[in-house]
Amino acid sequence: MIFVSKVHGNIEYEEKDKITFKKGILGFENLKEYALVDLKECEPFKLLQSLEDDEAGLIVVCPFEFFKEYEIKLSDEDTTRLDVKNQSDVVLLTTVTLDSDPKKITTNLKAPIIINISNNLGEQIILDKSDYKIKHLLIEE
């Protein structure tokens, strides 16, 4: 299938790869269906594009690419809501805020996006009891 994004143009995806966020994503609670798109020219970044709004897309990244020590513990409620049967089915991403100065690019370690790739259910969770920041510099000096 092809989705036309105002910002990123034609985005090809398979229906089986559509990710459903039952509660939406913070700031986009009314949008539930997304596609995760590789940005080959900007690896390791990816685009989480809404399939319901051609202007709604988020740049995301696997936080472990930049923060080897980053860790979260999914609650039993999280794993139940996402129907996680196997930890290897969980993909963890964080949203990225871009800046023309690469030293000012930030990522949200406080509210990661969790995707169960076995059933394509996703959810953004908030880590209440952590010292992680909403705007954590991606490249620390």
Curated annotation (Swiss-Prot):
GO terms for cellular component: cytoplasm
Predominant localisation class: cytoplasm
Keyword Chaperone: yes
Keyword annotations of the record: Bacterial flagellum biogenesis, Chaperone, Cytoplasm, Translation regulation
Alphabetical GO biological process terms: bacterial-type flagellum assembly; regulation of translation
UniProt family annotation: Belongs to the FliW family.
UniProt cross-references to HAMAP family, sorted A to Z: FliW
Record protein name field: Flagellar assembly factor FliW
